[in-house]
Amino acid sequence: MSHQSDLISEDILAYLGQHERKELLRFLTCGNVDDGKSTLIGRLLHDSKMIYEDHLEAITRDSKKVGTTGDDVDLALLVDGLQAEREQGITIDVAYRYFSTAKRKFIIADTPGHEQYTRNMATGASTCDLAIILIDARYGVQTQTRRHSFIASLLGIRHIVVAINKMDLKDFDQGVFEQIKADYLAFAEKIGLKTSSLHFVPMSALKGDNVVNKSERSPWYAGQSLMEILETVEIAADRNLDDMRFPVQYVNRPNLNFRGFAGTLASGVVRKGDEVVALPSGKGSKVKSIVTFEGELEQAGPGQAVTLTLEDEIDVSRGDMLVHADNRPLVTDGFDAMLVWMAEEPMLPGKKYDIKRATSYVPGSIPSIVHKVDVNTLERTPGSELKLNEIARVKVSLDAPIALDGYEQNRTTGAFIVIDRLTNGTVGAGMIVSAPPAAHGSSAHHGSNAHVTREERAGRFGQQPATVLFSGLSGAGKSTLAYAVERKLFDMGRAVYVLDGQNLRHDLNKGLPQDRAGRTENWLRTAHVAKQFNEAGLISLCAFVAPSAEGREQARALIGAERLITVYVQASPQVCRERDPQGLYAAGEDNIPGESFPYDVPLDADLVIDTQALSVEDGVKQVLDLLRERQAI
């Protein structure tokens, strides 16, 4: 099968070592319907000897049944795997294939050419270094050509190969090639593609001309074959080595003596002893060690998954970003972005969504559409909603600030996805364009315009603001415990208030369903209120089922890890059913937490109170002790 089969049979370890050192190039193929994308990939695999013999025999048989190439083997069948694709002779979903040569490793994304699958193309392009845009020599630059070129430009793909395919049907006429090249260059100038990043290749994917080997049928073409371009295009310089960005994926605490922050370095280089700050908090420290499974490193670069330990015990949580102290990104809760809408349900300005950028997960909304972009004509038009496959420049507003870069500067920290809060489906993909300069360094809406500082409020109330979430099954005793803690704190002269999940369903959260998604949304909406109470200096006590671990993590990002305390109020389902304070179990409802739908036990809870084993008074004492430990009271 492989060009290196001899080395594999002689010395497998040498082969694996050589293979590991190869540079990886991710590229995608796109173009109009039936331009030959899947055939091109099949040809690349076939001519680079990356097809197993039994696989080749299988597609030879299939070619006679569903092939479109007459007596020839239909190499497109190597990639068109869905039954609907083979029946219709088109590509519907993004198909990924892997192959390698002596010089490089490759991952190919074969993207669909139809307009209704623009979102699939955007998905395939998001991680690619290079795009191959196929043009049928018979038709020249088409609407889909312009659309895919615009999306490739939008998604920051820096290298584009314009493959003018089916030149055999035009007898490899140089005039046809030059005319299509001129037409494409005129369009490329409009969308800002640099001519230095463009390569034009006349080819026949079906016959193999100029795909892997140079063709004798185009003696006038002095350039490289497609494979030569793929093997030699310079992508190492595309990596950002200047701006150190380390999104924290999780806090690694295997034992009491180790606390590290795990993640993948998005860009830049980090070394032992580097001064870093955690954003958005702005707290600083130095890198103590860079830990991997194989041992410690002196430095790490883009794409490496490592665990960083710091000299100081500063508060760093999932979603935070570690950066060099002298090279900080913007910290803001608002920015402009180019957004590709990927859902059947239209995007409505002002609707609440979850915005996921790298490891941060923050509630937010899209207040307005600046303009929609017609990807066929590049015309800008106003809009009040965004439909499936439409692209627009929008304004994004977050409920909590995050650290971010522009997409051109950093494709990881400058990109985000939009998630529907009820279905958890990805509905949009965005590229950050800019952020308001005034937002730099902001940490919340409440700040520069406030006349009363947080310190003054803390001094007046004699406490530090905090939110305590009492989470557990229905009937576990959450509300009972929350109100008892409120009574005790109030008698101590503290400013405190209970936000009860059931009470809020009569007003703020009226109409929300009682299922898992509805109960998660019930808590997330209230988390905004709790945050505002904290801004006012109060202690918020929240009694909610909050069944979703993901929803609780989102609330932590919103309120702040240093302010949110999670108390798991524990009781067995049988005891909860016997207590049944709201009559939920007796009514035979089909929305019972832990029975009708899963309840994610808070494994990382700050405190666990077993209401079967402890009295209310004992539970109150444990909560107060924890508040004192956190220096809230």
UniProtKB/Swiss-Prot annotation:
Record region (G5): 204-206
Positions annotated to bind GTP: 31-38, 110-114, 165-168
Annotated region described as G3, given as residue ranges: 110-113
Every tr-type G domain range: 22-241
Binding positions for ATP per the UniProt entry: 472-479
Residue segments, region Sulfate adenylyltransferase: 1-463
Pathway in which the depicted protein is active: Sulfur metabolism; hydrogen sulfide biosynthesis; sulfite from sulfate: step 1/3; Sulfur metabolism; hydrogen sulfide biosynthesis; sulfite from sulfate: step 2/3
Swiss-Prot/TrEMBL keywords: ATP-binding, GTP-binding, Kinase, Multifunctional enzyme, Nucleotide-binding, Nucleotidyltransferase, Transferase
Start and end residues of each stretch annotated as G2: 89-93
The reaction(s) this protein catalyses: sulfate + ATP + H(+) = adenosine 5'-phosphosulfate + diphosphate; adenosine 5'-phosphosulfate + ATP = 3'-phosphoadenylyl sulfate + ADP + H(+)
Biological role stated in the UniProt entry: With CysD forms the ATP sulfurylase (ATPS) that catalyzes the adenylation of sulfate producing adenosine 5'-phosphosulfate (APS) and diphosphate, the first enzymatic step in sulfur assimilation pathway. APS synthesis involves the formation of a high-energy phosphoric-sulfuric acid anhydride bond driven by GTP hydrolysis by CysN coupled to ATP hydrolysis by CysD. APS kinase catalyzes the synthesis of activated sulfate.
UniProt name for this protein: Bifunctional enzyme CysN/CysC
Organism of this sequence: Pseudomonas aeruginosa (strain ATCC 15692 / DSM 22644 / CIP 104116 / JCM 14847 / LMG 12228 / 1C / PRS 101 / PAO1)
Biological classification of the source: Bacteria, Pseudomonadati, Pseudomonadota, Gammaproteobacteria, Pseudomonadales
Gene behind the chain: cysNC
